[in-house]
């Protein structure tokens, strides 16, 4: 028996003895082949030649089996189960948040070719059976699109929330919109008008009102500057005038009763309408662009036979506007 065989047997029994041979040892001793060995002349690791200077040794590199022994003085770690290393495809995953527009539009690819590469995961509807109604704002498609009517195009296209075509008007018939188009916006008149009051309200005691879009509601009868009883007189009886003596501004105090109040026939149209034109809509648009709300217009035909219009006179509201400006 030669000395080399004896030395190998002793080395296997005593791992603490250093190895003086130049041959590669496949021992599991910490001194010769462990990753925590302090010897710098260890040539048993194949990755020692490829190790760069200053590069730290990773615990998950250099072993084909994927397991690295712990450092000296520490118990070996229990191997992790394979289910943690590679999760199974049947494991539950986080469900993505569904969009508010999910299945609210038809899939173009499915409509053209009859198939879709995403299948059941497609965010669009495959047929009318999967099509859903999106949750819309209560005023969706109830107002005109200013960009479409002023510029002739809209960057939002079919997804715009405003009306591009008359067929898109989704307003309920018989119910006027609460929020209407403002006439003072770029001079664009609105095509819709508020429905007239019921016939039961058009009596001699309640005056008939004419509104334009974005106008304020009529004031209560108690707030009217002229009592409704003045309109219930006989057609030939002259209307009694009273001195209002308003105390709101100096110009109103200087105004005489004749310059403030005229006959009933003169109230058929506001005095400023003569300076604006003969079209009532033109007067309504100018009034809304000036003050934001329109002044009421009395209709003389309700209270008796029409009378010839008197000379144009200014109402107190226009005196206040001229003073404030």
From Swiss-Prot:
Record note on modification: Phosphorylated. Phosphorylation at serine and/or threonine residues occurs in a p38 MAPK- and MAPKAPK2-dependent manner. Phosphorylated by MAPKAPK2 at Ser-58 and Ser-184; phosphorylation increases its stability and cytoplasmic localization, promotes binding to 14-3-3 adapter proteins and inhibits the recruitment of cytoplasmic CCR4-NOT and PAN2-PAN3 deadenylase complexes to the mRNA decay machinery, thereby inhibiting ZFP36-induced ARE-containing mRNA deadenylation and decay processes. Phosphorylation by MAPKAPK2 does not impair ARE-containing RNA-binding. Ubiquitinated; pyruvate kinase (PKM)-dependent ubiquitination leads to proteasomal degradation through a p38 MAPK signaling pathway.
Any one Gene Ontology molecular-function term assigned to this protein's record: mRNA binding
UniProt entry keywords in alphabetical sequence: Cytoplasm, Developmental protein, DNA-binding, Exosome, Metal-binding, mRNA transport, Nucleus, Phosphoprotein, Repeat, Ribonucleoprotein, Transport, Ubl conjugation, Zinc, Zinc-finger
Region (Disordered): 15-101, 185-248, 260-325
Region (Necessary for localization of ARE-containing mRNAs to processing bodies (PBs)): 1-172, 98-325
Top-rank taxon: Eukaryota
Modified residue annotations for Phosphothreonine: 90
Region annotated Necessary for RNA-binding, chain positions: 95-171
UniProt-listed InterPro entries: ZFP36-like (IPR045877), Znf_CCCH (IPR000571), Znf_CCCH_sf (IPR036855)
Annotated Gene Ontology cellular component terms: cytoplasm; cytoplasmic stress granule; nucleus; P-body; ribonucleoprotein complex
Subunit structure of this chain's protein: Associates with cytoplasmic CCR4-NOT and PAN2-PAN3 deadenylase complexes to trigger ARE-containing mRNA deadenylation and decay processes. Part of a mRNA decay activation complex at least composed of poly(A)-specific exoribonucleases CNOT6, EXOSC2 and XRN1 and mRNA-decapping enzymes DCP1A and DCP2. Associates with the RNA exosome complex.
Function as written in the Swiss-Prot or TrEMBL entry: Zinc-finger RNA-binding protein that destabilizes numerous cytoplasmic AU-rich element (ARE)-containing mRNA transcripts by promoting their poly(A) tail removal or deadenylation, and hence provide a mechanism for attenuating protein synthesis. Acts as an 3'-untranslated region (UTR) ARE mRNA-binding adapter protein to communicate signaling events to the mRNA decay machinery. Recruits deadenylase CNOT7 (and probably the CCR4-NOT complex) via association with CNOT1, and hence promotes ARE-mediated mRNA deadenylation.
Protein name as annotated: mRNA decay activator protein ZFP36
High-level lineage: Eukaryota, Metazoa, Chordata, Craniata, Vertebrata
């Amino acid at each position: 028996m030669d000395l080399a065989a004896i030395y190998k047997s002793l080395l296997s029994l005593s791992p603490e003895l250093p190895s003086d041979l130049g041959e590669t040892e496949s021992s599991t001793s910490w001194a010769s082949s462990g990753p925590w060995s302090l010897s710098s002349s260890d040539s048993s690791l194949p990755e020692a030649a490829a190790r760069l200077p200053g590069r730290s040794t990773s615990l998950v590199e250099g072993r084909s089996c994927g397991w690295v022994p712990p450092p000296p003085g520490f118990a070996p770690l229990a191997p992790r189960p394979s289910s943690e290393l590679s999760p199974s495809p049947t494991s539950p995953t986080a469900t993505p948040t569904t969009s508010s527009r999910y299945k609210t539009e038809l899939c173009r690819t499915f409509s053209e070719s009859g198939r879709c590469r995403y299948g059941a995961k497609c965010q669009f509807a495959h047929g009318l059976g999967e099509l859903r109604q999106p949750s819309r704002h209560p005023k969706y498609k109830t107002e005109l699109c200013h960009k479409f009517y002023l510029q002739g195009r809209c960057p939002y296209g079919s997804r715009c929330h405003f009306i591009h075509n008359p067929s898109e008007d989704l307003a309920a018939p018989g119910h006027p919109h609460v929020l209407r188009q403002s006439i003072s916006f770029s001079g664009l008149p609105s095509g819709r008008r508020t429905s007239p009051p019921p016939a039961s309200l058009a009596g001699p005691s309640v005056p008939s009102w004419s509104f334009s879009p974005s106008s304020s509601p009529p004031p209560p009868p108690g707030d009217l500057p002229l009592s409704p009883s003045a309109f219930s007189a006989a057609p030939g009886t002259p209307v009694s005038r009273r001195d209002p003596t308003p105390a709101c501004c100096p110009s109103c105090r200087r105004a005489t009763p004749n310059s403030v109040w005229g006959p009933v026939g003169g109230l058929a149209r506001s005095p400023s309408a003569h300076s604006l034109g003969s079209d009532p809509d033109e007067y309504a648009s100018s009034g809304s662009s000036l003050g934001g709300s329109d002044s009421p217009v009395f209709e003389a035909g309700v209270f008796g036979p029409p009378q010839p219009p008197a000379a144009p006179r200014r109402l107190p509201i226009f005196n206040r506007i001229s003073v404030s400006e």
